[in-house]
Amino acid sequence: MARKHFGLAGLGAAAVVAAWVVAMGGADAAKTPNVSGTKHNLSVSGTGTVRAVTEAQVCVFCHTPHSAAPGVTPLWNRQLSNQQYTPYTSTTLDANDIQATLDQPGGSSKLCLSCHDGTLALGNVNVLNGVQNATIQMQGTSTLQPGTMPEGSGAQTGFTRRLGVDLRNDHPISVTFTSALAARDGELRPVDAQQRWPAGTGETIGIRGPGFKPQLPLEPTGAGALGQLQCGTCHDPHLLETDPA
């Protein structure tokens, strides 16, 4: 058994197993695309404790129509944090032996952290009804930094929505997933030269592209556009869990 416990192998193996269950048709029924029913629905109709006071639009907290504001990331309606993060580290993390230190968050991880690091107000959006740099009034936010993600049970408990900028007690992101990492770890899937598994088809693991949608998408955020594990590899905020078990 390779060295583990909060290392990447445990995470990677679990993710691959989960994706394989989906591929076999067992887990698909437990999730459905319905962001309005999730805690990521921050509109006034949201079922969570963090939601708008009056704003009824569901998508506007993250997304904006094409060309609604010049000079911003297409379809993204929030500023990105300029914080420097302390990445996850562990003596049992094989990726540290290869990368020396994990890269700064990139891709979808930066998008997630624009809310979840707690440095930016949840209601601050780039465009709202044609008005740039608008603020949506929110309820249920932090008592320490009003408007930002609430602390929940605390960053040291592992049960918080507010991750902060110190990611050492979270799980690895910005991990470059290569055959070298898989070989060193011993439990990860051995991707091919295009970072795909199964080799050639990459139905489960790979970098998303036109006509190619792996179930665990790596993101081309690494050096030389190598595929990396980011938040969006495993997490989709648009999916509603429908299985109470």
Predicted features and spans:
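Bacterial N-terminal signal peptides that target proteins for export
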Residues: 2-14
